[in-house]
């Protein structure tokens, strides 16, 4: 798939612009704080309905304005698809082919993206919430039922925690009903994640083995707060653990186990990657991103759109070349940079844009 054009109205520092893109490589050059990252963020926003940089929707709306609008024309194997998102203090509306979508899960997945940004390097040593977010974003794009199960799980989790925090005497029968619902959705979430990590590991290991000159193997492990030896045992073990921890949950007024507590661990040659070098971390994340591209193609039948936000400066010449080698000809790619000087072996077929103070000029 590839995005043919995009329109931004009152998005960050962009008042009103329309840009058309190359089907292959698009490079945005500009000094810092001119709007390069904002532009890539808008493409990400059109795909996932939210920013990867902030949880505050208000920050996305241009100062002094009440709403923003992002629209674009997507090309997929089955034809052209107009997409549109409108965001205001009343909420957001999403449209596919000019038709309003009742749920975000009906919209997300239409346009898939893989983002590689400097903050992705925190994935290995950062907090578990970063790694759960990584799973939720990537898996949610290629498996809509995952978003539905996750949303239902979070809804019941919120209910359970609110009930535990209430001053009422705990009704164990009512709590058991919540536990049953939590386990129903939570066990599905865990199973979705296990399948995803298994498939991602296969692809990522191939890339990492190549990037490391056939010296290193990569493994990703899913660390569940619910212990099990087989998928069929997840539900029963989850329910038993909730009951075992019930008094502790009542005392702490919080739910102590479930997929909202789960984590990932990365291993290079069976050693925890958190103890690895910066070079190994960069190779690992690069392998993950290339694996995401292949996995998206395998599941959806379309390559995703690749967004490289100022990461080329984070990679040495060797890893830049490996990245560009790993990008297939039919993967539309967007790169932001302050200079073309440190970019290695860029193909001749590219479209160059200059960004200055919220203005986008193509060359």
Curated annotation (Swiss-Prot):
<dbReference type="InterPro" id="IPR001238">
    <property type="entry name" value="DNA-binding_RecF"/>
</dbReference>
<keyword id="KW-0238">DNA-binding</keyword>
<dbReference type="GO" id="GO:0006260">
    <property type="term" value="P:DNA replication"/>
</dbReference>
<keyword id="KW-0742">SOS response</keyword>
<keyword id="KW-0234">DNA repair</keyword>
<dbReference type="Pfam" id="PF02463">
    <property type="entry name" value="SMC_N"/>
</dbReference>
<keyword id="KW-0067">ATP-binding</keyword>
<comment type="similarity">
    <text>Belongs to the RecF family.</text>
</comment>
<comment type="function">
    <text>The RecF protein is involved in DNA metabolism; it is required for DNA replication and normal SOS inducibility. RecF binds preferentially to single-stranded, linear DNA. It also seems to bind ATP.</text>
</comment>
<dbReference type="GO" id="GO:0005524">
    <property type="term" value="F:ATP binding"/>
</dbReference>
<keyword id="KW-0235">DNA replication</keyword>
<dbReference type="InterPro" id="IPR003395">
    <property type="entry name" value="RecF/RecN/SMC_N"/>
</dbReference>
<dbReference type="InterPro" id="IPR027417">
    <property type="entry name" value="P-loop_NTPase"/>
</dbReference>
<feature type="binding site">
    <location>
        <begin position="30"/>
        <end position="37"/>
    </location>
    <ligand>
        <name>ATP</name>
    </ligand>
</feature>
<dbReference type="GO" id="GO:0003697">
    <property type="term" value="F:single-stranded DNA binding"/>
</dbReference>
<protein>
    <recommendedName>
        <fullName>DNA replication and repair protein RecF</fullName>
    </recommendedName>
</protein>
<keyword id="KW-0227">DNA damage</keyword>
<dbReference type="GO" id="GO:0000731">
    <property type="term" value="P:DNA synthesis involved in DNA repair"/>
</dbReference>
<dbReference type="GO" id="GO:0009432">
    <property type="term" value="P:SOS response"/>
</dbReference>
<keyword id="KW-0547">Nucleotide-binding</keyword>
<dbReference type="InterPro" id="IPR042174">
    <property type="entry name" value="RecF_2"/>
</dbReference>
<dbReference type="GO" id="GO:0005737">
    <property type="term" value="C:cytoplasm"/>
</dbReference>
<dbReference type="InterPro" id="IPR018078">
    <property type="entry name" value="DNA-binding_RecF_CS"/>
</dbReference>
<dbReference type="GO" id="GO:0006302">
    <property type="term" value="P:double-strand break repair"/>
</dbReference>
<keyword id="KW-0963">Cytoplasm</keyword>
């Amino acid at each position: 798939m590839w995005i043919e054009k995009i329109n931004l109205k009152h998005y960050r520092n962009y008042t009103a612009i329309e840009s058309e893109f190359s089907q292959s490589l698009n490079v945005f050059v500009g000094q810092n704080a001119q709007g390069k990252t904002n532009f890539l963020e808008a493409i990400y926003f059109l795909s996932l309905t939210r920013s990867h940089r902030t949880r505050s929707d208000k920050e996305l709306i241009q100062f002094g304005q009440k709403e923003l609008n992002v629209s674009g024309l997507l090309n997929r194997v089955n034809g052209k698809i107009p997409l549109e998102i409108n965001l205001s203090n009343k909420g957001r509306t999403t449209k596919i082919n000019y038709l309003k979508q009742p749920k975000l899960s009906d919209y997300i997945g239409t346009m898939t993206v893989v983002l590689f940004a400097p903050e992705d390097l925190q994935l290995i040593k950062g907090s578990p919430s970063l790694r759960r977010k990584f799973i939720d974003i990537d898996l949610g794009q290629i498996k809509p039922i995952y978003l539905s199960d996750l949303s239902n799980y979070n809804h019941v989790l919120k209910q359970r925690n609110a009930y535990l925090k209430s001053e009422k005497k705990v009704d164990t029968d009512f709590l058991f009903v919540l536990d049953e619902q939590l386990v129903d959705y939570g066990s599905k979430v865990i199973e979705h994640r296990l399948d995803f990590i298994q498939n991602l590991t296969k692809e990522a290991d191939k890339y990492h083995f190549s990037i490391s000159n056939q010296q290193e193997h990569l493994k990703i492990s899913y660390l569940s707060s619910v212990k099990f030896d087989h998928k069929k045992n997840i539900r029963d073990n989850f329910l038993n653990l909730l009951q075992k921890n019930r008094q502790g949950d009542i005392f702490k007024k919080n739910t102590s186990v479930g997929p909202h507590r789960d984590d990932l661990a990365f291993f290079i040659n069976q050693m925890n990657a958190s103890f690895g070098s910066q070079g190994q971390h960069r190779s690992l994340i690069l392998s993950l991103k290339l694996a995401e591209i292949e996995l998206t193609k395998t599941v959806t039948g379309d390559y995703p759109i690749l967004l490289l936000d100022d990461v080329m400066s984070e990679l040495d010449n060797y890893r830049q070349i490996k990245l560009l080698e790993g990008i297939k000809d039919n993967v539309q790619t967007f790169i932001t940079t302050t200079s073309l000087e440190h970019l290695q072996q860029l193909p001749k077929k590219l479209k160059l844009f200059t960004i200055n103070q919220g203005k986008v000029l193509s060359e």
